[in-house]
Amino acid sequence: MSRFFANGSDSESESSEDEIQATNFNKASAFQFSDDEEEVKRVVRSTKEKRYENLTSIIKTIRNHKKIKDIPNTLSSFEDLTRAYQKALPVISKEENGITPRFYIRCLAELEDFINEVWEDREGRKNLSKNNSKSLGTLRQKVRKYIKDFEDDLSRFREAPDQESEAEDEVVAQESDGGDAGDDSDAGVKPTEAAPKAVKSAPAKAAPADDDDSDDSIDWDSDSESETESSDDENQYQNMRERFLKRTTEKEEKDDDKRKDKRKEQKVKIRKRAEDDEDGEWETVVKGHVVEKPKMFEKDAEIDVPLVLAKLLEIMSARGKKRTDRRLQIDLLFELRDISDQHNLGTAVSVKIHFNIISAIYDYNQKISEPMKLEHWALLLEVMQSMLKLLLANTDIIMSESVAEEHEEYVTAPFYVRGCPLAAVERLDDEFVKLLKECDPHSNDYVSRLKDEVNVVKTIELVLQYFERSGTNNERCRIYLRKIEHLYYKFDPEVLKKKRNEVPATTSTSVDVMDKLCKFIYAKDDTDRIRTRAILAHIYHHAMHDNWFQARDLVLMSHLQDNIDAADPATRILYNRMMANLGLCAFRQENVKDAHHCLVDLMVTGKPKELLAQGLLPQRQHERSAEQEKIEKQRQMPFHMHINLELLECVYLVSAMLLEIPYIAAHEFDARRRMISKTFYQQLRSSERQSLVGPPESMREHVVAAAKAMRCGNWQACANFIVNKKMNTKVWDLFYESDRVREMLTKFIKEESLRTYLFTYSNVYTSISIPSLAQMYELPVPKVHSIISKMIINEELMASLDDPSETVVMHRSEPSRLQALAMQFVDKVTNLVDVNEKVFDMKQGNFFQRGNMGNRGDRGYNRNQNNQGGNWLGQRRDRNNRNRNQRGHHKNNQDRQQQQQQQVQTIDEE
């Protein structure tokens, strides 16, 4: 091997070195190393190691800046961190399968907590410098925007922040060492090739666990200045590439030794703890900080009420702290309850422990927007009902939030316990709704969760009984409202049977229960929100059971429509649901006009699904931000409380058809005709614009086809389009008494088709026989007579009834089609002329109409005297006005002549 790669000894002279270099001159001489560089061992680092090392160094810098509250540098370091993470993304997606490293998520969580802490400290913010204050606002905005992509990872991290990955263990080890090598070391990546180093012998107990580590460690004797090193180098660097590889320093080797020693010590401690266990059973060892289960009481301790309460206070004092094991806290409380029951410390102590267990279960889920786990839900129901049964069974226990902690009494009756079962049951109800929203509504999970409503209502009943015995009016109103909200949307068939006298009059129905609960709230409530929600639920329940007049009177007397805009979103949603159900009730009770008025505000917007909180429209996704969408999803109603939107739209369109089609026929040639229903009118016009219309398929197409048939007076085709097998399945079978609704619809279609027929063809007939109309529309003769009489009285139809002959005599006062079109044409031409005259006046100007015109005024006056250059525009306007007056006078003469002819006819008949 060439002597270029060998190190010369200290005894060699400089002249000999020069000779060696001169004789062995080649290309490799440019890469010759000094003695210091040769001592450094070199290894190849992967891209993952480089990227992770860059991330961890920036994270450590951010932590240092946070300690001294250097916010501008924290901001710049955060920007560097985001750029470094962007560079590391390809490595993360390849090596970690796209899973964000835990140490990076921990850094984001700590940074978010730091910003929130500084931001909430208002006094401290006032003392910040201008630069720090500005940087804090910028940093807060950037962090909030950036962590939106890591919401799921952050939520999982916050559920178990104590668990540390191997990467984080190395980061902690580096920070604890405090050496310079720790600043630049890699956190989260183990070296691909361990360097040889000396390792001390492990303890005897830990020897089996350290076999792998001991295999990797080899003892090397090194002397950098001996001649053997040069010979070793000669043998070691057989390859040119090996010469240029970076090697770890001795300092880094020592750091690695320290880390491994710490891990070994931790393993030894865990193993000793397992060996010292009396039962000798296996224990699952979790990563991260291991917390020993505290002992409840000493063996010889005398367990009494003060001792148990002190232990309870000790357990609950850890509530809300960062490293509290919430599962262990619940287990300790259950154990404490069992100890209390074994030593018969009294029911009051048991109630207190029960209430703290409920609080601990609620605290387990840190994110209040997410539903709790099913195991905790079942446990919560059980503990809640157990506590309430104890309260109801012992009348000498008073549990209230007004009881101060120093005034609690557990030894002598009456017992006073601080707590609020009402707040607990309200939270229970909210958690039940969250569980329902989390499930797929078309799965069996939703059905199984819905079965829990029986237990929830039973729990509410227990709380209601307790507060009826000892509670304020405000507390009773709150618990009554909770019961109302579980009752108002449920249909009770006993109500309709009671109306038909099919059940005894003493039978208690849901309407009676609602009346009792709501009337108490009307009388005793002092908050507007509870009373408003009770009224809305009461109206909804009345409307569901066809109590149209009671529901309508409640709406009119409460004036809800005047101040509902000032209510909270949940109350506005309930108001929309009430109006929708009220419209359905009016339709079932044959009040088509009222049904249309109730539903028009919901349907004209085009988004009834959002207004009723039954889902979000994907078409409007760009109109709302992610935060708004999250809030709106939290407001959604559970699926079993939804109102069928297709049924709602069908009722609205059918009501609009029954009102709009006769109105269109009556005002066919009226240029100023207004639209009763804009939505229905648009559907009708879009169908008329189509060149080829096929048979109807959807619900809307069926209604439009029925409307076209009604315009021709064909009631049979109209009824067939509205009431058929497909429409029955989609819409009408959803009503409670569907046969009665179908009969009502057919009757209305006949009546409105008759009205449309008379409006459309009145100018064709001289007289029409009433029996023939009754036969044509399959209506009783008195009904036809009544319809025509109303039309004549309301001046909708210019005709008279001849009772002896049972005919309707038309008066032909309405213009024919040609006359109506001619009158429309004249009006439009007149309007066009007026517009042109105004435009011409604006172009000419009005200079000569001013008072001070000088000599030109005399000349103009002379011309006017000679009828030259007169006001010809004014003359034309006067002429047009005279023509209009003549047309009006001519029309008045015609009307007068017709009236005289009618009087003559009546005299002749008499």
From Swiss-Prot:
Q: Which residues carry this modification: Phosphoserine?
A: S34, S165, S176, S185
- Which GO biological process categories is it annotated with? formation of cytoplasmic translation initiation complex
Q: What residue spans carry the Basic residues bias annotation?
A: 882-891
What is the annotated localization of this protein?
Cytoplasm
Q: Which GO terms describe its molecular function?
A: RNA binding; translation initiation factor activity; translation initiation factor binding
Q: Where is the composition biased (Basic and acidic residues)?
A: 240-268
Superkingdom of source:
Eukaryota
Q: Does the keyword Phosphoprotein apply?
A: yes
PROSITE patterns attached to this UniProt entry: PCI
One of this protein's Pfam families, by short name? PCI
| Extent of Low complexity compositional bias | 193-207, 862-874, 895-910
Q: Does the keyword Phosphoprotein apply?
A: yes
Chain spans, region Disordered: 1-21, 157-281, 847-910
Entry keywords, A to Z: Cytoplasm, Initiation factor, Phosphoprotein, Protein biosynthesis
Which residue intervals define the domain PCI in the entry? 639-815
Described by its record, this protein's role is as follows: Component of the eukaryotic translation initiation factor 3 (eIF-3) complex, which is involved in protein synthesis of a specialized repertoire of mRNAs and, together with other initiation factors, stimulates binding of mRNA and methionyl-tRNAi to the 40S ribosome. The eIF-3 complex specifically targets and initiates translation of a subset of mRNAs involved in cell proliferation.
Protein family according to the UniProt entry: Belongs to the eIF-3 subunit C family.
Q: How does it assemble?
A: Component of the eukaryotic translation initiation factor 3 (eIF-3) complex. The eIF-3 complex interacts with pix.
Q: Which HAMAP family match?
A: eIF3c
What is the name listed in the Swiss-Prot or TrEMBL entry for this protein? Eukaryotic translation initiation factor 3 subunit C
Question: What is the native source organism of this protein?
Answer: Drosophila yakuba (Fruit fly)
**Name of the gene:** eIF3c
